[in-house]
């Protein structure tokens, strides 16, 4: 068994996911290769929310994979796979858990196998609708993380879909200008 720990350039020194996780505190902190400010509170919350193995979460637009890598490092019973348009962007998700699609509108065909989806700072609300319409039949819930100011552009994509039961957890270690929304199927 080989464990490959990706490295990141942070503050002039090389750091792996273990070293980065030790820098986390309850207060959100910015990292150069993640749009979302990250805190130990947020990682703990997401690890408790996301499904446990053998189920997995698909992070659509995972970027460097820092958030996803920190979640898996925190709780190894959680599996998070990434989807991105370019595999070279990824630095923290294990290669076998990284999936590449052709372009910003590309859908990963096995997305319906995931128990949950996570969108972190997504660029286009229409991509969420496209995923829901194409692969949303078997997904249990969707987590949206991004700027509060952007939520109004995304809210209709959820409220007009099967995932219209929305919750807005607070006190989970985000900055005041960021939010998380958990979208579940309406009952």
Tell me the role of every PLM-derived stretch.
Residues 63-65, 87-88, 123-125, 148-150:
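Short, solvent-exposed loop/turn segments at secondary-structure junctions
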Residues 52-53, 76, 112-114, 138, ...:
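Residue-level preference for short coil/turn positions at secondary-structure junctions
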């Amino acid at each position: 068994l080989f464990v490959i720990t990706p490295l990141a350039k942070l503050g002039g020194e090389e750091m792996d996911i273990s070293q980065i996780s030790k820098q986390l505190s309850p207060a959100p902190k910015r990292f150069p290769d993640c749009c979302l400010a990250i805190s130990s509170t947020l990682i703990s919350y997401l690890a408790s929310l996301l499904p446990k193995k053998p189920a997995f979460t698909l992070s659509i637009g995972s970027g460097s994979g820092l958030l996803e890598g920190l979640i898996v490092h925190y709780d190894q019973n959680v599996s998070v796979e990434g989807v991105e348009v370019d595999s070279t962007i990824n630095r923290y998700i294990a290669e076998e858990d990284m999936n590449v699609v052709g372009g910003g509108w590309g859908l990963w065909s096995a997305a319906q196998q995931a128990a949950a989806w996570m969108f972190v700072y997504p660029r286009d609300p229409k991509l969420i609708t496209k995923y829901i319409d194409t692969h949303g039949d078997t997904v249990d819930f969707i987590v949206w993380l991004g700027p509060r100011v952007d939520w109004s552009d995304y809210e209709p994509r959820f409220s007009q879909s099967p995932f219209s039961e929305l919750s807005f957890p607070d006190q989970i270690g985000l900055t005041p200008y960021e939010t998380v929304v958990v979208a579940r199927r309406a009952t």
